[in-house]
C-alpha cells in the first residue's frame, strides 16, 4: 500500500473481510464476493457523485473515476494474489483456517 494509507486502513478492511467470512459460512463464497464487489462499486459511485454538483459534472468525470477505481483495484488484487502465491501453504494449508 502507499505511504498515504492511514493507520486505520487495514482495520477497516479487516472489518469488511470479517463480515464476508461470516456470510461465507451461510452461502457460496463466490456469491459473497459478488455482493462485496457490488457494494464497493455502489459506494464508489456515490463517492464520485458526492464530489460533483450535477449529473453533467458526474458524467464529465465518469471516465476518470472508472480509470482510477479500476487501476487501484487491479493493483490491490495483484498485491494480494502475489502474497497468496508467496505464502500459499501458510494461508491455505491444513490448520490455516483458509478464510479471507
Feature locations, PLM:
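Solvent-exposed interaction surfaces and binding hotspots enriched for charged
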Residues: 2-100
Amino acid at each position: 500500500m502507499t505511504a498515504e494509507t492511514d493507520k486505520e486502513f487495514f482495520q477497516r478492511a479487516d472489518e469488511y473481510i470479517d463480515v464476508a467470512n461470516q456470510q461465507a459460512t451461510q452461502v457460496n463464497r463466490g456469491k459473497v464476493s459478488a455482493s462485496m464487489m457490488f457494494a464497493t462499486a455502489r459506494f464508489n459511485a456515490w463517492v464520485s457523485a458526492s464530489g460533483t454538483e450535477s449529473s453533467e459534472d458526474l458524467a464529465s468525470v465518469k471516465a476518470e473515476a472508472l480509470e482510477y477505481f479500476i487501476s487501484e483495484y487491479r493493483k490491490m488484487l495483484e498485491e494480494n494474489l502475489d502474497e497468496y502465491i508467496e505464502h500459499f501453504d501458510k494461508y491455505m494449508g491444513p490448520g490455516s483456517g483458509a478464510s479471507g
